[in-house]
Structure formats: structure tokens, C-alpha cells
């Protein structure tokens, strides 16, 4: 934020304004990269994800203790912060502010694709609301891996992710799924 003092006038003010406009034009909004990570074998990571993790300013990780193994394996030194189920709303606000100030951020989960039964939804929603650009770098997703090796129909499927721990809710969902004709994927 810039404040011009009232004592600057005429040509001096015009020059300063011109410089400020150029600075503002040169300021870039950061970007969110949703980076899929390996679901078992570290070598399943894509080159694009590796390059992105090395180039961004910050990595937001579901569990930094878990993700450090991946980063160390590939000699990635990018700073990391936590972004998980229990801090997602407040942390998403913070991360969006960082991106609005030009910081590029990669979001990774412990395994698989952010937002698919892992943290990511809230941050993506807030990025859209704030006009922060984002992109998804495809890679492993456990549900698709399971589907492809199941031998079941793959053209149409239903992904329900994790069933609730509440017994009544779980029973209700299972009763609903009995009528489902598509292949069902559950975690």
C-alpha cells in the first residue's frame, strides 16, 4: 500500500504516480499449484511436480513430518508450512493473502491428489473467491489406481471416499449404495 503526501505537487507527483503504477503492474499475484504426490512409491512422482516443488516459494503440506521424507528424497529445500483438516480455514486465509502478495505455493498431501479425500477444497474455494490463479498437476489418486486394477467396470463409477465413523450414518450410506449400479469405490 502506498500513500502520497499532500506536499508533493505538479511534475514530481506525476513522476511518482507513474513509478507507482509501473510497480503495481510489475507486481505479480502468486499462484496455487495442487501437486499430486506418490501413494506408495516415491518414484511415481511426475517431473512437473518435482520442478514445481523446487520452484515455488512455499510448500503447504498436510503433514510436514511425512512430507519432509519426500522432499529430502528429491533434495528439495523449499520452505514448508502445515495445511491440514484442523487448521484449513484460518490457514487458507493466510495462504491466500500470501499469494495475493506474489508468493507461489504448492499444496501437497501425504499421498495422492489434494482435495480428493485430503485437504485442499477450502484453499481452492478461497483462491477462487480472491481471484488467485491455480492449477492442478495431475498424478496419483488412490481411487483411480484401485479402479484400474479392480477388473470391474470403469466407464461409470461412484466414489464415496471414507465412510463416516458414526454407525447410523455409515449404515444409512451403505443402504443407499445397495441401489447403486455403478462400480463403487470406498476407502
Show where each model-derived region lies.
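Glycine-rich, highly charged phosphate/nucleotide-binding loops
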Residues: 87-95
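Glycine-rich, flexible N-terminal cofactor/catalytic loop recognition
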Residues: 18-86
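Short glycine-cluster motifs
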Residues: 101-158
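Short active-site oxyanion
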Residues: 53-59, 131-134, 183-184
Amino acid at each position: 500500500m502506498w500513500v502520497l503526501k499532500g506536499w508533493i505537487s505538479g511534475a514530481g507527483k506525476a513522476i511518482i504516480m507513474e513509478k507507482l503504477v509501473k510497480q503495481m503492474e510489475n507486481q505479480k499475484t502468486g499462484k496455487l499449484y495442487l501437486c499430486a504426490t506418490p501413494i506408495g512409491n516415491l518414484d511415481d512422482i511426475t517431473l512437473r511436480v518435482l520442478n514445481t516443488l523446487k520452484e515455488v516459494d512455499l510448500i503447504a503440506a498436510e503433514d510436514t513430518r511425512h512430507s519432509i521424507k519426500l522432499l529430502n528424497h528429491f533434495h528439495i529445500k523449499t520452505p514448508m508450512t502445515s495445511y491440514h483438516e484442523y487448521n484449513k480455514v484460518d490457514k487458507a486465509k493466510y495462504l491466500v493473502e500470501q499469494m495475493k502478495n506474489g508468493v507461489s505455493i504448492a499444496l501437497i498431501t501425504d499421498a495422492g491428489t489434494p482435495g480428493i479425500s485430503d485437504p485442499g477444497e477450502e484453499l481452492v474455494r478461497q483462491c477462487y473467491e480472491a481471484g488467485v490463479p491455480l492449477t492442478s498437476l495431475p498424478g496419483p489418486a488412490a481411487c483411480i489406481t484401485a479402479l484400474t486394477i479392480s477388473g470391474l467396470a470403469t466407464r461409470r463409477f461412484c466414489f464415496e471416499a471414507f465412510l463416516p465413523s458414526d454407525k447410523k450414518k455409515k449404515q444409512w450410506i451403505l443402504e443407499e449404495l445397495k441401489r447403486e449400479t455403478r462400480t463403487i469405490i470406498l476407502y
